[in-house]
C-alpha cells in the first residue's frame, strides 16, 4: 500500500508550490485555516495513507509546534524540521507524504545545521575579516563573493592610503554643500583605489573591497547545470548579512581564499551538503569537506541527481581549449 501511494504521489500534481518559495507559506496558510475550520487540505489524502481523522491530529500537533517556534520557520529546511519533530512517532510514509505535499525536503534530503564558527583560528589562517552587509550584486557565482570591510577595522586602517582617506573627507564636505557632481567624482576616485563608501546604520562608511574565493569547494559555472542554483543558494545565505571570513592565502587572480561563516553557518558545508559544489581536493584536502560531498552524493541531491555531472575544472579546461 505504501509503495502504491508513493507511486501515485509522483503522478499527481503537488500542492502547487515550490520548495524554494511557496511551501512554507502554503503550510502556514493551511495551519491558519485548520485553526479556524478544523479542516485539512482536501488533496492531502492522495499523498498519505492515514485517515482524515489522523490527518487532523497531525495538524493539531504541527499547529502547536508552529505557535511555539521562535522564530517561526522561514525556510523549507526549517519548516521540514518542525514537521518531522512534531510527527516523530507517526508513520514514515505519512510524514514523507505530508512533506512532499508542500514541496518540503524529506528527512533523507534534509541538510543538517552546520557547525558554529571556530573559537580559535584554524591552522593556516593568515587573518580574519569581519565584513559589512553583503550587497545583492556581490555574489558572482556559487563560490565567489565580493565583500567590504570598514576602514575602522584595524586590519584595514593600518594600510589605508592617505589619498583615499582625504578623498572620503572631501566627499563628505561636498555632500554637505550639496555639490553632488564633485561628490560623485570623488567617489569614483575612491572606487578606483579599491574602496567604496557604504551606507551602514544611517551613516556613510569608508570600506575596503575584498574578493573572496571559498576555500575547498568548486561550484558549477553559471552556464553549467546547477550553476544558477549554486549562485542563488550562496546569495540567499549571505545577502544583507555581515560575514566572518578566515583567509588562508591569495590566488593568482588576487582573490582571498578562505572560509566564510554567516550567522554561525559554515557556508562551504551548506554548499557541499546541498549538492551545489564539489570538494576541490586539489587545493584543500580537509577530510570534512570530502565527507560532506560524499553525503550529498549518497542522497543524490543537487548536481548529484546526475550519475556523472561534469566537473567545473574540466568544463573550464574544455572552454579554454575551444571545445
From Swiss-Prot:
PANTHER family: EBNA2 BINDING PROTEIN P100 (PTHR12302), STAPHYLOCOCCAL-LIKE NUCLEASE CAN1 (PTHR12302:SF24). Its cofactor is Ca(2+). The active site is at 213, 221, 255. Binds 1 Ca(2+) ion per subunit. Its main location: membrane. This is Staphylococcal-like nuclease CAN1. Enzyme that catalyzes the hydrolysis of both DNA and RNA at the 5' position of the phosphodiester bond. Possesses activity toward the single-stranded DNA, double-stranded DNA and RNA. May be involved in genomic DNA degradation during programmed cell death. Pfam families: SNase. The keyword Calcium applies. A lipid is attached at residue 2 (N-myristoyl glycine). It comes from Arabidopsis thaliana. One of its GO terms (cellular component) is plasma membrane. InterPro entries: SNase_OB-fold_sf (IPR035437), Staphylococal_nuclease_OB-fold (IPR016071), Thermonucl_AS (IPR002071). Keywords: Calcium, Cell membrane, Endonuclease, Hydrolase, Lipoprotein, Membrane, Metal-binding, Myristate, Nuclease, Palmitate. Inhibited by Zn(2+). Ca(2+) binds at residues 143, 218. SMART domains: SNc. SUPFAM superfamilies: Staphylococcal nuclease (SSF50199). Residues 130-306 form the TNase-like domain. Belongs to the thermonuclease family. A lipid is attached at residue 11 (S-palmitoyl cysteine). It is found in: Cell membrane. The keyword Membrane applies. It is an enzyme of class 3 (hydrolase). GO terms for molecular function: endonuclease activity; metal ion binding; nuclease activity; nucleic acid binding. Its EC number is 3.1.31.-. It is a lipid-anchor.
Amino acid at each position: 500500500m505504501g509503495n502504491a501511494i508513493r507511486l501515485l504521489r509522483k503522478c499527481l500534481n503537488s500542492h502547487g508550490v515550490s520548495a524554494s518559495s511557496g511551501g512554507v507559506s502554503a503550510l502556514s496558510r493551511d495551519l491558519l485555516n485548520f485553526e479556524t475550520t478544523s479542516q485539512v487540505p482536501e488533496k492531502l489524502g492522495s499523498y498519505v495513507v492515514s485517515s482524515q481523522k489522523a490527518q487532523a491530529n497531525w495538524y493539531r500537533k504541527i499547529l502547536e509546534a508552529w505557535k511555539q517556534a521562535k522564530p517561526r520557520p522561514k525556510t523549507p529546511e526549517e519548516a521540514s524540521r518542525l514537521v518531522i519533530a512534531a510527527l516523530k512517532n507517526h508513520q514514515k510514509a505519512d510524514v514523507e507524504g505530508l512533506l512532499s505535499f508542500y514541496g518540503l525536503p524529506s528527512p533523507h534530503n534534509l541538510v543538517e545545521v552546520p557547525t558554529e564558527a571556530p573559537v580559535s583560528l584554524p591552522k593556516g589562517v593568515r587573518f580574519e575579516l569581519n565584513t559589512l552587509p553583503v550587497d545583492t550584486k556581490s555574489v558572482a557565482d556559487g563560490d565567489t563573493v565580493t565583500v567590504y570591510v570598514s576602514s575602522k577595522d584595524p586590519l584595514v586602517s593600518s594600510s589605508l592610503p592617505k589619498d583615499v582617506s582625504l578623498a572620503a573627507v572631501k566627499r563628505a564636505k561636498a555632500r554637505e554643500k550639496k555639490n553632488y557632481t564633485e561628490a560623485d567624482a570623488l567617489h569614483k576616485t575612491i572606487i578606483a583605489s579599491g574602496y567604496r563608501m557604504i551606507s551602514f546604520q544611517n551613516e556613510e562608511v569608508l570600506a575596503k573591497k575584498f574578493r573572496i574565493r571559498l576555500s575547498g569547494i568548486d561550484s558549477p559555472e553559471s552556464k553549467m547545470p546547477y550553476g544558477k542554483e549554486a549562485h542563488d543558494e550562496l546569495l540567499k545565505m549571505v545577502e544583507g548579512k555581515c560575514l566572518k571570513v578566515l583567509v588562508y592565502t591569495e590566488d593568482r587572480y588576487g582573490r582571498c581564499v578562505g572560509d566564510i561563516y554567516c550567522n554561525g553557518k559554515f557556508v562551504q558545508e551548506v554548499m557541499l551538503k546541498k549538492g551545489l559544489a564539489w570538494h576541490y581536493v586539489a587545493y584543500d584536502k580537509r577530510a570534512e569537506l570530502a565527507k560532506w560531498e560524499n553525503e550529498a552524493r549518497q542522497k543524490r541531491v543537487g548536481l548529484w541527481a546526475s550519475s556523472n555531472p561534469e566537473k567545473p575544472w574540466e568544463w573550464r579546461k574544455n572552454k579554454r581549449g575551444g571545445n
